[in-house]
Swiss-Prot record:
Organism for this UniProt entry: Polaromonas naphthalenivorans (strain CJ2)
Annotated signal sequence range: none
Name the record gives this protein: UPF0246 protein Pnap_3166
Family (UniProt): Belongs to the UPF0246 family.
CC terms in the record's Gene Ontology section: cytosol
Biological processes per GO annotation: response to hydroperoxide
InterPro entries registered for this protein in UniProt: YaaA
Length: 258
């Protein structure tokens, strides 16, 4: 099984990585192409394009200027350790050992507007470029057109060795949309996390994000190999609800009656 996650806007380059193991990102040529487009924009244009404050726009213009096609220990950090935010707080990769990170490297893909797909140990330079950004390039009017079938093609390559390939989708709709379903050959199983609020179950965004990270952590710790095993996830009070689920949509609930 391959697990898919979204990236995070928040980054941590201040905390040193606790492991030295790393790999080079796979789509460096495409990333350089996007950086060239971004470098040509003024802070005001970046602010408008990405709906950022002047301060954040300035920070990211500086990041684009500093970005280099050579990824080193001085300008990069392993993606799974660099991303911060709710998903990555749940995953808590800084407390995973080398063997666990090696397993994650083989079973986790992080979707990215700039990098396409990142493996956990891929070196990553700091950036901000959400997949839904309407960035016009030579390949189209947005990043979905820029990436086209490339991400799905890569996932097909990764899943090719599996007899019954399964993609466990823990990414947001914005990011999973970058995976061409027409091209993707694997079965897709989506996990949904709901909370009891008022008189019904609802998806609460920041809680669902954390739960996605917790699910990946559970998969890593238990080296999950089948969809059936996903149903055993019970971190922080969640419980699989068979009655609310479908074959390819697993619902986990927390709160009253769960």
């Amino acid at each position: 099984m391959l697990f898919l996650l979204s990236p995070a806007k928040s980054l941590d380059y201040a905390t040193p990585a606790h492991v030295a193991a790393h790999t080079q990102p796979l789509f460096k040529r495409q990333s350089a192409e996007l950086i060239a487009v971004l470098k040509a924009k003024s802070p005001q244009e970046i602010s408008s394009l990405m709906k950022l404050s002047d301060a954040l726009a300035g920070l990211n213009v500086a990041r684009y200027e500093a970005w280099s096609p050579a990824f080193t220990a001085h300008n990069s950090k392993q993606a799974v350790l660099a991303f911060n935010g709710d998903v990555y707080a749940g995953l808590d990769a800084k407390t995973l050992g080398e063997a666990q990170l090696a397993w994650a490297q083989d079973h986790l893909c992080i979707l990215s507007g700039l990098y396409g797909v990142l493996r956990p140990l891929d070196w990553m330079q700091p950036y901000r470029l959400e997949m839904g950004t309407a960035l016009v390039t030579g390949r189209g009017k947005n990043l979905y057109q820029f990436w086209g079938a490339q991400i799905a093609d890569y996932l097909n390559e990764r899943a090719a060795t599996d007899v019954s390939p399964v993609i466990v989708n823990l990414a947001s709709e914005e990011y999973f949309k970058s995976v061409s379903r027409k091209v993707l050959k694997a079965r897709v199983v989506t996990c949904v996390f709901e909370e009891w609020r008022g008189d019904k179950y609802k998806i609460i965004s920041f809680m669902a994000k954390r739960a996605r990270g917790l699910m990946v952590r559970y998969a890593i710790e238990n080296r999950l190999a089948t969809v059936e095993k996903l149903k055993g996830f019970e971190a922080e009070g969640y419980c699989f609800d068979a009655s609310a689920s479908a074959v390819d949509r697993l619902v986990f609930r927390r709160g009253q009656g769960a």
